[in-house]
Structures are given as C-alpha cells and as structure tokens.
Amino acid sequence: MAKPIVAIVGRPNVGKSTLFNKIIGHRISIVEDQPGVTRDRIYAEVEWLDHYFTLIDTGGIDADTEEIIPAQMREQAQLAIETADVTVFMVDGRAGLTTSDREVAEMLRKSHKPVLLAMNKVDTSNRLDSFYEFYELGIGDPIEISSAQGLGIGDLLDEIVKHFPENKGVIYDDDVIKVAIIGKPNVGKSSIVNSILGENRVIVSDIAGTTRDAIDTPFNDGEDQYVLIDTAGLRRKSKIKENIEKYSVIRSIAAVERADVCLLVIDATEGVTEQDTKVAGFSHENGKGTIIVVNKWDLIEKDNNTMNKFIKEIRTELAYLSYAPILFISALTRQRMPKVLETVKFISNQRAMRVPTGGLNEVIGEATLLNQPPSDKGKRLKIFYGTQGSIKPPTFVLFINDKKLMHFSYERYIENRIRENFGFEGTPIRFIYREKSGRD
C-alpha cells in the first residue's frame, strides 16, 4: 500500500524548508533568509511512531518575486489538494495574518481533506496576538511551532499521523500489475496510455499540463490484469513556467508509491533532463521495476549509430538504473508499442522471482573465489552464506563477519554476479547484512 503524502504549503519565507529539514533530521534543502531559495530535493521519506509517509516541501516551487506570490500560493494549495493526504499550512506568527493566507485557507477548506495550521516563529514576541488572529482562517486551532528551534515539532507530527487515511487510495488485488507512467510534462505519457489501451481514454494535447487528473485505467490483455496510472498534469497552466516540471515531479511521487512497474518516459528530442533523473531516482529508491521508454523516436534523424549514442547517454546520466531495459518507441505511430506491455509483464515477473538458497550460495561462493572480498587493517570480509528474504523488490540477506568491511563496489560486484546467474532484469536488488562469527 502506498505511503501517505504530507505537503507543507505557505508563502515564501515562513520557514517551510526549515521545518522540512527539522523533520527529516538532516539538511538537504538550501535554507537562507530570502524567499525562493529552495532549489534542491523536495521530498523525503519520514518515520514517526511507526508511521511512514512521504513529506513534500513546496518551498522547492516558491516564486522569487513578491508580485506573483499570491498566484504562486494558490498553485501550491492546488497541488496539495490534488496530491497530499494531509496538508500542513504554515503561517508566520511574527508577521501575522495576510491576504494571501486567507485566500489559500479558503481553497484548503473547500478541499475536504485534512489541513493542519502550523503557526511558526512562536519563539518571538507578540505571538498571542497572532494566535487568535489565525482563528479567522477557520482551519482549527493553530499548532505553535518554531521550525528553527525545533519547538512543537513532535506535537505537529502527532497531529499529522492522526489524520492519515486508514486505506491509502484504491486497493487492487495482488495479481493486478500496477503500471505508473512517469516523466516530465509533454513527453507523451497520455499518448502512451492511449496507445496501450487502443482507445482514447485520456485527453491528449500538445500543451504541457493538460491531463486533468491522475487517472487509473484498469484493463485486461486477455491474460493478465493491469492498472495504468497516468500522472496528473496541472489543472490549469501554471503562471510560472518553471513550476510545471516541479509540480509533475511531486505528482510522479504519488504514482510511483502505488506502482509495481514504472515507465519512465523520456523525450527523444530532448534527451535526459534533470527532472528525469529526479523521477528515476524516486522509482529506484522505492524499489520499483523501471523501464526507460524513449518516446518520439520517429522524430529523430537517424544513422547506424544513433540508438547506441542514446543508450550511452542514458546509461551515463541514469547510471543507477543500469538494470532497466530501454525501449525506443513512438506512441503516435505505434512503433514498438507492443513491446511495452510485453516488457512490463516480464519485469513484473522478475520482481516476484525467488531463487533457491543452495543456488544463491553457489553463486556467492564462486564470486568470492574469483574476486577476493576486501579487507581493512588485516581483517578480511567473510560472507558465510546468504538467503533471499523477500520479493518486490528482490532482497537478499547476507550473513557476514563485519558490516564495515562490505564496500559499495564489492556489493555491486555480488549484485552483478546474482543478476548474471538469475536475471532480475528491470528491478533493483536490495541487500540486508547480518553479522555473525564463524563459530555461530
């Protein structure tokens, strides 16, 4: 089941990124005392009292100029309404209530989704005046916090997890293959959905951000049940051009959470972009099957080496997806489209595959003989044995003498040997290490 999504919204410089960093426990966003400075990662996985959720910092889509702040805040609120299960509406207790605060509060109230009002900067004076002022918003009791000092953060998190839905979204049977179509706007995601379905079930336009909602489309190919999850575009075209791609990253997060296999759609006319790397990273980190789909291949002038050049670029820019197959298609002309669903089915089976413990340990033993494990200060890594702990993604438990001796490069080596012998194409592989002595 997908993890709940929590969005922090509010006007620039109220402390959204500081709160985001305080909650996740380390500083990954750029924080300065100027509006519009968050330029880095905008999501993180959070655990609080055995509740797991995805936290989104909409500070990553703040405007840089005061003139467009009201419009920007409305877009933030709309994003939260469409995507988040719980919205934290952050206001500045020092500055007091603003017209923009009132406008966004009205939108959030109409959404009928849980909204928590966080009054920041309570470590300053005159907070009581602001406290009662914010009751005008009609969102409920302000939760007093100081994101800079860490005051009240635990109370806020307690309230957040209380409002999580019991069932996150539609629950499909385990045998239904859930496929998320992800990628930046205007790469042809909806056209791919339509081509797979063979009918026009999703509105398609050449204008980025015209898909009206995230649309789940169940269908049967005669053998298996599928659900295509088409990530939503903007409900309306953003007034700020740069926001469109950032919004779609956040919407992709929600789709990836629910998926078994992700189709990462790349525009052949543009190549791999920064946003492609962000969305691809989220799919990889969440253990999803991934297929890299290069769309609009019909628009590319080709010679004998064109495809190889594209493959090299993709493997360089998305090196962590070395396991992901690459398909070159045209949703418009249906070039190689039958291969897409065929590959989805194959990757889904690869994610669910189990290998025998005996065969696994033969591969590991042979690998350690061919390439001796690393050592440090005279102590050498020993892999006593391994077993497959789980599937989706395939996860292996290795019993070793010292976790600190397992270098990333050697883990990659073991992973490659496992892939060479058993497959697992299109899916990440995870390792869990358990320490034991040779006498155990």
From Swiss-Prot:
Disulfide bonds: none annotated. One of its GO terms (biological process) is ribosome biogenesis. Residues 353-437 form the KH-like domain. PROSITE patterns: G_ENGA. The keyword Nucleotide-binding applies. Pfam families: KH_dom-like, MMR_HSR1. The keyword GTP-binding applies. Residues 4-168, 177-352 form the EngA-type G domain. Associates with the 50S ribosomal subunit. Belongs to the TRAFAC class TrmE-Era-EngA-EngB-Septin-like GTPase superfamily. EngA (Der) GTPase family. This is GTPase Der.
